[in-house]
Amino acid sequence: MYKEDTIAAISTPHGAGGVGIIRISGDKAFEIAERIFRGKKDFKLIRSHTINYGKIVNPENGAVLDEVLLSKMEKPKTFTREDVVEINCHGGMVVLKNILELCIKEGARLAEPGEFTKRAFLNGRIDLSQAEAVIDLINSKTNESSKAAISQLEGKLSRKIKDARSKLIELLAHIEVTVDYPEHDIEEITGNMVYEEIGKIKEKLCDIVKSFERGRIIREGIDAVIIGKPNVGKSSLLNELSGKSKAIVTDIPGTTRDIIEEYININGIPLRIIDTAGIRETEDVVEKIGVEKTHRAIDEADLVIMMIDAKRGMDEDDNRILTMLGDKKLIILINKIDLVDEKQINEIESLLKGRKCIRTSVKEGTGISELENAITELFVQGEVSVNEEILLTNIRHKNLIDMAISSIEKAMESIDGSMPLDLVSIDITDAADYLGQITGESVSEDVMHEIFSKFCLGK
């Protein structure tokens, strides 16, 4: 249920900072601000959508909590389409907490996670897919994932979905008139006409679904794991790719005993890359635990980067690792090529029996760009960019479009089987309902709760 009260929350991340923001939204937002804000003008005289210097004061005892900049925004030209006040204060958590507690004491309620965005949806400011784009934008890790979220926030996907749903509803209305009111002087709709129209809609929906795998990778990224024997250069590779000295690099085998991970940007693709403990037979209890974690990381990974030491060559440990990987997406690096001659590298490549390999010297930076290009080519055909096209990035949307397509196909099969149009309309109604769940035109309270619970406080 929509609670028509006034909410408040800290909208900036927790921790010390130069500036912190408290957001208030609802019918009592201005009333609360008037009681606690002391500026050059009376609060009622402050124009909407202006920033005003003043102090936050406890009205009970006159104690000053902080010097602030306050923004007053009158409905409906606000994010929530309610009266909104934003208080920009100093960023210490004590100051923020004290001002928030004062707002609550004066009549606001602590907002639930995502409640500001939920109110924007419920008040018609954005639709449900645009609301989901807000969290995608907050969580984006590359320029391309940010662009994809902004495209969805601007309503590009919504317009396509609403257009398809609107055409289905028009067809349903035409079918209803034809079936229920044959005496009316309206052009009769036939099964062939319905078949042709829903076929066009299905084609457009299929085009959107085709973009999902690419969109998913841009939004969610790839989980990649670096594996190989101890001291093959895994930690050095992680440090080289991330540009940080995150992993300890020594000549002692088995130095990395736990999982180390880093988020990096590879040609526009968010990559969560994991450095693992070297895989070998060992009696060391701690190292054994690390090896077990490595096996779990491999199972969950989208991509495995296997490193082979060119100086030591291939051995049973390497063969055992290759066998264990099965049909996992795999890139093999022959590392430390600066320490060996061409003959030794060729011998390793012949033992790998035609598997694609990249020759690298992580120490010298050789082969790193080839690795980055290989990762891109393995997951995305062509350039990783978000231009004017619609990119489907959300699995919830993809599943609902798939169900809409399935319902349309059932309707087409029914028409092929000469079923009456009033029965055909059942599947068309289902298709329209599935599309409505994407934009929020037909969605349950449980689904809304699930979506908005993923937001943090203040959003």
UniProtKB/Swiss-Prot annotation:
Entry keyword set: Cytoplasm, GTP-binding, Hydrolase, Magnesium, Metal-binding, Nucleotide-binding, Potassium, tRNA processing
Gene3D superfamilies (UniProt xref): P-loop containing nucleotide triphosphate hydrolases, Probable tRNA modification gtpase trme, domain 1, tRNA modification GTPase MnmE domain 2
Annotated Gene Ontology cellular component terms: cytosol
Compartments, as annotated in UniProt: Cytoplasm
Residues the record lists as binding Mg(2+): 235, 256
Matching HAMAP family: GTPase_MnmE (MF_00379)
Family of the protein in this entry: Belongs to the TRAFAC class TrmE-Era-EngA-EngB-Septin-like GTPase superfamily. TrmE GTPase family.
Name recorded for this polypeptide: tRNA modification GTPase MnmE
Organism of this sequence: Acetivibrio thermocellus (strain ATCC 27405 / DSM 1237 / JCM 9322 / NBRC 103400 / NCIMB 10682 / NRRL B-4536 / VPI 7372) (Clostridium thermocellum)
Encoding gene per record: mnmE
